[in-house]
UniProtKB/Swiss-Prot annotation:
Gene3D superfamilies: 3.30.70.3110, DNA-directed RNA polymerase, insert domain, RNA polymerase, RBP11-like subunit. NCBIfam families: PRK00783.1. Belongs to the archaeal Rpo3/eukaryotic RPB3 RNA polymerase subunit family. This is DNA-directed RNA polymerase subunit Rpo3. InterPro entries: DNA-dir_RNA_pol_insert, DNA-dir_RNA_pol_RpoA/D/Rpb3, RBP11-like, RNAP_Rpo3/Rpb3/RPAC1, RNApol_insert_sf, Rpo3/RPB3_RNA_Pol_subunit. GO terms for cellular component: cytoplasm; DNA-directed RNA polymerase complex. PANTHER family: DNA-DIRECTED RNA POLYMERASE, DNA-DIRECTED RNA POLYMERASE II SUBUNIT RPB3. It comes from the Archaea. The gene is rpo3. Its EC number is 2.7.7.6. It is found in: Cytoplasm. It comes from Picrophilus torridus (strain ATCC 700027 / DSM 9790 / JCM 10055 / NBRC 100828 / KAW 2/3). DNA-dependent RNA polymerase (RNAP) catalyzes the transcription of DNA into RNA using the four ribonucleoside triphosphates as substrates.
Length: 271
């Protein structure tokens, strides 16, 4: 069973019960390596003179190597549509169409700082950079930047630029059972961590650190009156995304992807 503990656009914390450590690690690896994401793969730089509408001439040579700029462009998180095809699986046979490729352009005249907001989607205006203020390069007077880019779908196992998540971690569900008769200051923990209380009776009170409370860490130092147990069939996960997908979209896809891979494995074993 899956329960969401905390949810934001780009962050989620949830619990899953009734699974083994091997399954938990499979979920973690899927979240890191196997989520589709849109990222810039091809960059074409215009080299030579550029003229503005008033006839002023600019030099399109950049202060950084083209390879460095291309790498920076590839690492800019882009809004992602999971309905897009992978280029090698598209009906266009890898030529690049609107179903598998998003084209972008940058046309900037110096002196100016070039930011990710200058990366303009051409054929799909909704798939813009997540953060408009990521710096790319600084142009001096008389310099210009004119590039066209192609973004395609990929997975984190192929390159870090296609990795949606960061900080993917999990731990066992843990409970701290306090004997009220043996630990005099038990009420201190109840006052400081009210959301962590999961049960209470006349003689005992039980906390969990599924909902984090820094004061619970002090219970590890108590000499008596505290029993700490871990459940190796229930896990607490948390991760955040770079904004290309929401956290709930990422989790939903990961679970479906894992189920699909298990089904494919079972089919291959039965043949």
């Amino acid at each position: 069973m899956l329960d969401i503990i905390e949810l934001k656009d780009n962050y989620i914390k949830f619990s899953i019960s009734g699974i083994t450590p091997a399954i938990a690690n499979s979920i973690r690896r899927t979240l890191i390596n196997d989520i589709p994401k849109l990222a810039i793969e091809n960059v074409v730089f215009h080299h030579g003179e550029i003229r503005d509408s008033e006839g002023n001439v600019y030099d399109s040579s950049l202060p950084l190597f083209d390879e460095v700029v291309a790498l920076r462009l590839g690492l800019i998180p882009l809004k992602t549509d999971l309905k897009m095809n992978f280029r090698d699986q598209c009906s266009c046979n890898g030529e690049g169409c609107d179903l598998c490729t998003v084209k972008y352009s940058i046309n900037k005249l110096g002196p100016a700082d070039v930011f990710s907001s200058d990366l303009i989607p051409i054929n799909n205006p909704d798939l813009k950079p997540v953060d408009p203020m990521i710096p790319i390069v600084k142009l001096k007077k008389g310099q210009a930047m004119l590039v066209t880019c192609e973004a395609i779908m990929g997975r984190g196992k192929d390159h870090a630029k296609w990795q949606v998540t960061s900080g993917v971690s999990y731990k066992y569900h843990r409970e701290f059972k306090i004997n009220k008769n043996e630990l005099e200051n038990w009420s201190f923990y109840k006052d400081k961590c009210p959301k962590s209380v999961i049960s209470e009776n006349e003689n005992e009170i039980t906390f969990t650190d599924d909902v984090e409370c820094r004061y619970l860490q002090q219970l590890f130092d108590e000499k008596s009156g505290v029993t700490i147990t871990e459940d190796d069939t229930k896990f607490i996960f948390q991760f955040e995304t770079d904004g290309s997908l929401t956290a709930i979209e990422t989790l939903d896809y990961a679970l479906k992807r894992l189920k699909e891979r298990f089904n494919n494995l079972m089919e291959s074993l039965s043949e």
